[in-house]
């Protein structure tokens, strides 16, 4: 007889290697074929809804690790909710209008000027949809479960129709208006930009000090006195209409080299050296309020520049007197309106000077900086020029500087409902908590929202103009356009004449001849995505508004979180979301932003081909995503190592329950040994902790909890000593079936707990566990937290034992290093204990030699009895010696009773007994 044939060794079809890049697509094809997404929705019919609303990624370019981070977090949440008693449909979306798509089309060599706007827009739509298809494939390969056949896409007619309704409702409430005021203008995009489309970068600029001569001092200043201003935008001097001083600041008149100058008193010490005023004497001090309406002359144009009082003039920098060009700045515009100044902005859409700036016509504004400075020097008005580096607004798409430029634009008035917005922010639950402060401050401080764009690819502003120039936005026109867009798409606006866009028989008092024109501007893309609560949540029967969760990157406080809040509060009076969760950015291993120029980009598609989607997903679960996260080949290697441990744990569990039938072989909880109960209690604790962590969206905690359970509780303890039972004992022995009961429970529980994070691997485990025809793991619910008898008492006892076991392990390790023993199975452990530890061991049930994975064990009361050579710790001393006896050929334990059965001279008594009873015919 071959004794090895009597061992019950593990058997499983679950492979050691995941081979994820090849296996995952097979599971995905199966899920698609079986309509798994639909089955999950059916299973959860009638359950309480939990709606995570997808913030639409922009349909341009390859997926990056930020996309993978974002979509995986969402998928983990939706999968968790779907297994936790909720109905959680997930409708993915795409943002498809805007400049990058226009630019991409232009790069293909399309001659835009040689085709109609409608034709150009068709090309944009085709391009956007190919991008959507490419990204959809990438997201599906990542294992994201959703309604991929019916996503929401902002260019679809049904979406655009609802967006028009949002605009119409806001207009009806008086929130939409047209006005000329300075807006962020991007010469590189030839369009106005919203605050959300601005990013700040360092820029080197000319900083100049300029003297404006007083022509009418109102009895306060002598004629010819110079008021000194400071600016970092010399190109705006041709648009200067005034100077602003603070009414509550003191200003001094100083005399230097026969000239008089006015600056803020508080800034004089800085300016003495900077402007060469070291020897200047103070002639008089005046209050800013006294300087109001004094008249100065523009340095090189024959026009006045009025001195005004404004709070935005401060003594923090410069001279305390602010150059004011109402056409090129927010504060300048407001004070210019107050003092009835001309709103002059002498630039065209490309940032080139018009004939309203004599001497600079046809010059690009940035080029004009040098010319203006030279002109000021020529007329003797330039006191000083230097270069500074400062934070300056840039177009987030083109990365080029933007300017403030007064143009006629359409706005959404924030002032009209700002208090409602702030109240709504307070009513939302924010994670991280600082998100509330961030958005609250943004809403509190923001100006009106410029919603018009001078571009082609977007949703047209549904506005008509009468013959007298009056803008027409009525319920009748809005409803008509909404239905036209629903039927034909928004391109109909550019394909048809005005008369074919208006309702039949439409008349208006401002058009006695029945003539109308239409607006040619489109809406800001943030209005597109910001309308999704109406176009998706409100429009789809399976979804609800407000959503339970909006979850995006932290850049969306100024973007989608903001625009969605604005449109939703405007038309419904409440926020479109109950909870908002934000994540950081994906950086490289050294914490740098990923960029092609640095050569440090890591693309999810490439990682999935090499390692598999489940590794990317496990990486997402491993990081503290609320801050910026790091990813690199080295980090993914570490994650792969954890994956390997989890997989090996599952393989061991599966291999050792191959002959276990849960229906007939399960040992009831009360009939388990204490150590088995202890493991089920630990497993139950894991269920509670993991479910709590899922609920709090703390996936990195789950990663550590499960990794720790697999490594410490299972691999290093329970599964390790189990081999002496499940391989060696008779198939149906109570101890073996008890351990298999725990293994089975652990396999089922871990598979369910990991399913939202590792959908492919857990499906593979589940198939192996349940067998052919198994219903998908993703149609199961998460395990319940159980009430287990005596759990506190058992846990306290066995936790204390585990601490002592740690000391025994250290002693064995020491003995191995000292070459006292080879494998631990050759050892005898003599444990010297104090009274407390003795009481503990007396109360424990178990074969301690087996639990310590040694051949012999002796317990001795009295620490004082331990020899000098013993390994000592606070409660115990451990003496390691070589076990006496022979090694049993079958179980490899050193026993004194090897050969007790003469028919089996190489077996110990236990093994001989098993062989005789179960394997001898």
From Swiss-Prot:
| Entry keyword Nucleotide-binding | yes
* The name this protein goes by in its record: Isoleucine--tRNA ligase
- Chain's role: Catalyzes the attachment of isoleucine to tRNA(Ile). As IleRS can inadvertently accommodate and process structurally similar amino acids such as valine, to avoid such errors it has two additional distinct tRNA(Ile)-dependent editing activities. One activity is designated as 'pretransfer' editing and involves the hydrolysis of activated Val-AMP. The other activity is designated 'posttransfer' editing and involves deacylation of mischarged Val-tRNA(Ile).
UniProt domain comment? IleRS has two distinct active sites: one for aminoacylation and one for editing. The misactivated valine is translocated from the active site to the editing site, which sterically excludes the correctly activated isoleucine. The single editing site contains two valyl binding pockets, one specific for each substrate (Val-AMP or Val-tRNA(Ile)).
PROSITE patterns noted in UniProt = AA_TRNA_LIGASE_I
User: Which parts of the sequence form the motif 'KMSKS' region?
Assistant: 593-597
Q: What does the entry list under GO cellular component? A: cytosol
Predominant cellular place of this UniProt entry's protein? cytoplasm
Where does the chain bind ATP? 596
Q: What is its EC number?
A: 6.1.1.5
What reactions does this protein catalyze? tRNA(Ile) + L-isoleucine + ATP = L-isoleucyl-tRNA(Ile) + AMP + diphosphate
What's the family?
Answer: Belongs to the class-I aminoacyl-tRNA synthetase family. IleS type 1 subfamily.
Report the residue ranges where the short sequence motif 'HIGH' region is annotated in this entry. 57-67
Q: Cite a single GO MF annotation.
A: ATP binding
Q: Which residues bind Zn(2+)?
A: 888, 891, 908, 911
Q: Where does L-isoleucyl-5'-AMP bind?
A: 552
What are the record keywords, sorted?
Aminoacyl-tRNA synthetase, ATP-binding, Cytoplasm, Ligase, Metal-binding, Nucleotide-binding, Protein biosynthesis, Zinc
UniProt-annotated location(s):
Cytoplasm
């Amino acid at each position: 007889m071959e004794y090895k044939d009597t061992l019950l060794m593990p058997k499983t079809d679950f492979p050691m290697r995941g081979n994820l890049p090849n296996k995952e697509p097979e599971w995905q094809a199966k899920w698609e074929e079986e309509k798994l997404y639909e089955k999950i929705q059916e299973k959860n019919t009638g359950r309480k809804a939990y709606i995570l609303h997808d913030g639409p990624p922009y349909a341009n370019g390859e997926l990056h690790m930020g996309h993978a981070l974002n979509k995986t977090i969402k998928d983990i949440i939706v999968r968790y909710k779907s297994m936790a008693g909720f109905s959680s449909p997930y409708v993915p979306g795409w943002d498809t209008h805007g400049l990058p798509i226009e630019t991409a089309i232009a790069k293909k060599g399309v001659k835009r000027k040689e085709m109609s706007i409608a034709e150009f827009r068709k090309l944009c739509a085709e391009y956007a949809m190919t991008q959507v298809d490419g990204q959809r494939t990438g997201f599906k390969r990542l294992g994201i479960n959703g309604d991929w056949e019916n996503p929401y896409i902002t260019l679809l007619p049904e979406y655009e129709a609802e967006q028009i309704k949002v605009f119409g409702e806001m207009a009806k409430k008086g929130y939409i208006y047209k006005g000329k005021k300075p807006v962020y203008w991007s010469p590189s995009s030839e369009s106005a930009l919203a605050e959300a489309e601005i990013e700040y970068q360092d820029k080197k600029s000319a900083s100049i000090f300029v003297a404006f001569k007083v022509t009418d001092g109102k009895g306060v200043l002598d004629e010819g006195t110079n008021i000194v201003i400071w600016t970092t935008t010399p190109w705006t001097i041709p648009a200067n209409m005034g100077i602003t001083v603070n009414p509550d600041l003191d200003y001094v008149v100083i005399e230097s080299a026969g000239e008089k100058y006015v600056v803020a008193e508080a800034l004089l010490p800085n300016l003495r050296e900077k402007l060469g005023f070291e020897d200047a004497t103070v002639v008089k001090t005046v209050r800013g309020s006294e300087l109001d309406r004094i008249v100065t002359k523009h340095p090189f144009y024959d026009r006045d520049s009025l001195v005004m009082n404004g709070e935005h003039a401060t003594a923090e920098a410069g001279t305390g007197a602010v150059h004011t060009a109402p056409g090129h700045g927010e504060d300048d515009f407001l004070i210019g309106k107050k003092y009835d100044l001309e709103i002059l902005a002498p630039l065209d859409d490309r940032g080139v000077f018009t004939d309203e700036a004599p001497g600079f016509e046809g010059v690009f504004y940035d080029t004009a900086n040098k010319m203006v400075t030279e002109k000021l020097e020529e007329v003797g008005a330039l006191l000083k020029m230097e270069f500074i580096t400062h934070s300056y607004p840039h177009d987030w798409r083109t990365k080029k500087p933007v300017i403030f430029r007064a143009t006629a634009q359409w706005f959404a008035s924030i002032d009209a409902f700002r208090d409602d917005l702030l109240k709504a922010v307070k009513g939302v639950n924010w994670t991280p908590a600082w998100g509330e402060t961030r958005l609250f401050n943004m809403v509190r401080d923001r100006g009106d929202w410029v919603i018009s764009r001078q571009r082609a690819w977007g949703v047209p502003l549904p506005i008509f103009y009468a013959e007298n120039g009056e803008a027409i936005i009525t319920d009748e026109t809005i409803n008509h356009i909404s239905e036209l867009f629903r039927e034909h798409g928004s391109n109909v606006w550019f394909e048809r004449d005005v008369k074919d866009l208006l309702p039949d028989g439409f008349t208006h008092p401002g058009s006695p001849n029945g003539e109308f024109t239409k607006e040619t501007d489109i809406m800001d893309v943030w209005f597109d995505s910001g309308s999704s609560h109406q176009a998706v949540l409100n429009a789809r029967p399976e979804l609800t508004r407000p959503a339970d969760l909006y979850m995006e990157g932290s850049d969306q406080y100024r973007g989608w979180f903001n625009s969605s809040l604005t449109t939703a509060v405007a038309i419904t009076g409440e926020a479109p979301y109950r909870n908002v969760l934000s994540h950081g950015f994906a950086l490289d291993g050294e914490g740098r932003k990923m960029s092609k120029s640095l050569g440090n980009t890591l693309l999810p598609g490439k990682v999935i081909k090499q390692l598999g989607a489940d590794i990317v997903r496990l990486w997402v679960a491993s990081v503290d995503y609320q801050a910026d996260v790091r990813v690199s080949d080295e980090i993914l290697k570490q994650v792969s190592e954890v994956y390997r441990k989890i997989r090996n744990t599952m393989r061991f569990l599966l291999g050792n329950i191959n002959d276990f039938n849960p229906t007939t072989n399960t040992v009831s909880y009360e009939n388990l040994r204490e150590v088995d109960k202890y493991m089920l209690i630990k497993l139950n604790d894991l269920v509670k902790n993991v479910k709590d962590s899922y609920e709090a969206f703390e996936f990195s905690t789950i990663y550590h909890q499960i990794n720790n359970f697999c490594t410490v509780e299972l691999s290093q303890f329970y599964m390790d000593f189990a081999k002496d039972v499940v391989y060696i004992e008779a198939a149906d022995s109570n101890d073996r079936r008890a351990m298999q009961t725990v293994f089975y429970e652990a396999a089922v529980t871990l598979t369910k707990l990991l399913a939202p994070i590792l959908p492919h691997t857990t499906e593979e485990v589940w198939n192996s566990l349940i067998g052919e025809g198994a219903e998908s793991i993703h149609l199961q619910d998460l395990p319940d937290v159980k009430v287990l008898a005596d759990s506190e008492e058992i846990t306290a006892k066995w936790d204390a034992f585990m601490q002592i076991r740690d000391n025994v392990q250290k002693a064995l390790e020491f003995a191995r290093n000292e070459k006292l023993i080879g494998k631990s199975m050759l050892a005898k452990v003599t444990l010297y204990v104090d009274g407390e530890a003795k009481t503990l061991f007396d109360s424990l049930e178990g074969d301690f030699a087996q639990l310590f994975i040694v051949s012999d064990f002796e317990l001795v009361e009295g620490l004082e009895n331990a020899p000098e050579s013993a390994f000592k710790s606070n409660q115990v001393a451990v003496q390691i010696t070589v076990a006496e006896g022979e090694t049993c050929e079958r179980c490899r334990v050193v026993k004194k009773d090897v050969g007790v059965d003469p028919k089996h001279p190489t077996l110990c008594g236990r093994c001989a007994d098993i062989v005789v009873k179960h394997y001898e015919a």
